Each structure stands twice: as C-alpha cells, then as structure tokens.
Amino acid sequence: MSKASVVIVGGGIVGLATAWQWGRSHPNESLILLEKEDSIAKHQTGHNSGVLHSGIYYKPGSMKAINCRQGKKLMEEFCREEEITYEICGKVIVATREEEIPALEQIFSRGQANGVNCEKIDQSRLKELEPHVNGISGIHVPEAGIVDYSEVCVKLQKKIQEQGNQIICSAKVLNIHQSNSEIILETTIGEVRGNYLVNCAGLYSDKVMGLTSQKTEMQIVPFRGEYYYVKPEKEYLCKNLIYPVPDPAFPFLGVHFTRMIHGGLECGPNAVLAFAREGYKRSDLNFSEFLETLKFTGFQKLALKYWQMGMGEMWRSWYKPAFVKALQRLVPEITAEDLIVAPAGVRAQAVTKDGSLVDDFLVDETENILNICNAPSPAATASLNIGRLVSEKLATRFV
C-alpha cells in the first residue's frame, strides 16, 4: 500500500504541472501521481501540435482566457530556466471570404480585451508575413509561439521526483471509495491512499469522476484530430503559423499550418468523432466506448444539431482531396502530393446532457476531490497556471 497527502490521477501535462506546483508550495506534504500508461504524456499531451497560444480566441474573463494568458508567461519562464527550446514566432489568422470578417473582428476584440499583442492587417501586410497565403485580411499575433510539450513533461517529471514525490506508471485506477477522511484508490499496482484527490485523467476524466461520490451529467466525447506533414521541399509555403477564422459555433480552430520547434511543418487537425477514447486511427474501435457515446443523450442532440458539419469532417478524414481543399483556402499552392500522413491526436471534449460543447475549462470540486473535467486546448499552454490554481485550492483544505 502507498500513501500520500495528495494523489493525482493522470500523467499528462496538467497532472504533472499540478504535481510540480504542489511540491513547490508544500514541500512537507507528500504527493503521488498515478499514470495508467508505462510512461508519462502518452495521450493528449504527447499528440499536441506544440503551439504556445496567446489567448486571443477566448471569452474575456473565462478560465481559458485567464489561464492561457498567465500560463503562457509561466511556460516561457519555465522553458528559459530549464533550457527548453521554444520560439516566439508569431501567427496570422486569415479571413479568406467577406463573410468571415465579423468573426475575425470578434476575435480581434477578444484579443484586445485579453491583453494580447495583436494587430489587424490588410492583404499586403499579410503577404509580407506569409507570401504564399490567400486572404483578404487578417490578424497578426506576434506573441504566439512553438515548443515541444513532451520535453516540458520530461523536465517536470524530473523536478517532481527531485521534490521527493512519486510518479507511478502502469497504475490504472479501478475503483475509488472513501473511509472517514481518506480516499482509497484500488489500482493495478495495489491500494493507494490519500487525503485529497486531483483528477487530471483527460480522456477518462469523467470515468474517474464516476468512480467517486461525485456525479456529473456531462460526458467526454473523443474527437480525433488528423494531421499531415508537409514534404521538406514545400515547407517554404509557410514561414510560421497560419490559422483560418474558426467557426464561432465550435471550440475547434480549423485546419491550420504549424511550424514545429525541431523542424518540419505540419497541417491539421480536423475534428472527427473517434470510435474509441484512444482512437488514434480510423480503424480503432472500442465497441463499448463507442456504444456509450452513441447512447449518450448529449451526443445525440449534438449530432442532430450539427450533422452536416460532422459529415463534412468525416468526409475530410476519409477523402484526402477534401482535406487538401480546406488547406488550399489558406495556401492555394499546397497539393495532395505535398502531404505525408502524420500521427493523429484525440481531443477530450466535454459535452453536456443538453448537447452543448463545453467551451471553457471545467473544474468540479468537493471538500477533498478536485476533478478537472474539461481541459482541451489551450490546456498545455495554460498548464502551469492551472496547476498553480489547483494547488492553491488544495491548500485551503489543509488546516
């Protein structure tokens, strides 16, 4: 049996950031982090596009806006201190049609309200920044950047262990129950006990929450995001980061071009329903998980409302020319021959019972349990601040 003051479930970047921040502020209170895989950062974090988000898209005052802005500063400081390579390269958000201008204006207004360094640009300035882009106007965000979040996680893992706290891999949580003031977790490596539990289980955060006494009407619906690498000889088509104007009805940013910190250029992702919570390939099927998604009232309402968009995403997934067509709206010179299939990611998206996509970070808490229920993008950028806030919340429970 293992025991600690705090037990964290989930070894992605949010769980690791929380563990590190706790260890910094409470060096005398023990912590155990449990990860079901054989190493850290195997899922959302390890399949991240590596963008340091500025916070331009998010509703002012929202958890995403606040944590992204503060988290980005903390992430840059951490990278400098730990000698992790990152680059503030800038990005452009591009309107290709007149009907996108109102949404572009709203993004710019949000950026200003959130304190983001951004400017509206015309077609000629757009061409100066990205000579191969097609657009009628746009927004330049000089402070956006790129980093390898897996490297950040490796460094966090080392620092957590240096604090004297434990990271236990291959430790899947099977059941959770409470006895007096203790939380008892039954895992594949035996019993783990703690006074406080933080659920950072990402794609399975609702499942872990369901093992506790807390109940929720939301459910995680997995959306696969598929990527392509651009062949080296065509990387000149994008100098830094090129994004479209996203559909304001969805918390997805649309297929875009991303230069990577260690070289190379990738494009994507789309957002297609995955048939398994860890369904990184189109052929991946977990029948019970897929059936659970289909039976969920919230998903049924979501699918009924947005079936056309869903079918379009599915079409782009199966038919490469359709994916290429979406990219050509931004960079007309890109062709199907320029693209090489890259690893996909899966986004853990919380959906409510009424069919709404949860658009903000969601934290559910009781006296001794904190569940981070919805932490998709920009959670990697925001992770160090999320970890700091969770640590502060936990601290109020210690007498």
What are these regions (language model features)?
Residues 1-14, 32:
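Beta1/beta-strand and adjacent pyrophosphate-binding region of the FAD-binding site
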Residues 17, 176-286:
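Flavin-dependent oxidoreductases
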Residues 23-47:
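Glycine-rich FAD pyrophosphate-binding loop
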Residues 41-71, 82-86, 273-309:
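Glycine-rich active-site loop/strand segments that organize a redox cofactor
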Residues 50-125, 135, 254-255, 276:
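Dinucleotide-binding Rossmann-like beta1-alpha1 core, especially the glycine-rich loop
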Residues 59-70, 94-103, 139-159, 168, ...:
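Short beta-strand to alpha-helix junction loop
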Residues 139-196, 200, 204-207, 382-395:
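Helical element adjacent to the flavin cofactor pocket in flavoenzyme catalytic cores
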Residues 282, 297, 302-399:
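C-terminal catalytic lobe of FAD-dependent flavoproteins
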